[in-house]
């Protein structure tokens, strides 16, 4: 069984193999959290990592709720403000189901 931090490590490694550069992990604010902050070319990428050992109750991609998307967007906006970044960004999801990794670019 993979737990949260192990899933994030696996997702980070997968994204680095795809050419992204790691910036920061587990950025927390009172109103939201960003699992991974990465860079890809000139884009800053805010990544939500979801893990499910089985899909019988819904897959990892379906586990991202509208409320969670709102919190991630708010956290990313705050991150860009406090770091004084005026750069293009996107939101990706890495869904790990069992031993399969699915990377959804520009997910929301």
Curated annotation (Swiss-Prot):
InterPro entries reported in the protein's UniProt record: Restrct_endonuc-II-like, tRNA_endonuc-like_dom_sf, UPF0102_YraN-like
Recorded GO MF terms: nucleic acid binding
Organism, scientific name: Shewanella sp. (strain W3-18-1)
Family stated for the protein in its record: Belongs to the UPF0102 family.
Pfam family membership, one: UPF0102
Protein name (record): UPF0102 protein Sputw3181_3835
């Amino acid at each position: 069984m993979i737990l949260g931090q192990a899933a994030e490590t696996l997702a980070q490694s997968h994204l680095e193999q795809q050419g992204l550069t790691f910036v920061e992990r587990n950025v927390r604010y009172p109103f939201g959290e960003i699992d991974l902050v990465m860079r890809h070319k000139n884009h800053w990428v805010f990544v939500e990592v979801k893990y499910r050992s089985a899909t019988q109750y819904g897959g990892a991609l379906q586990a991202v709720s509208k409320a969670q998307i709102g919190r991630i967007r708010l956290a990313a906006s705050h991150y860009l403000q406090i770091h004084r970044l005026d750069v293009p960004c996107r939101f990706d999801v890495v869904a790990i189901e069992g031993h399969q990794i699915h990377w959804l670019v520009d997910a929301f």
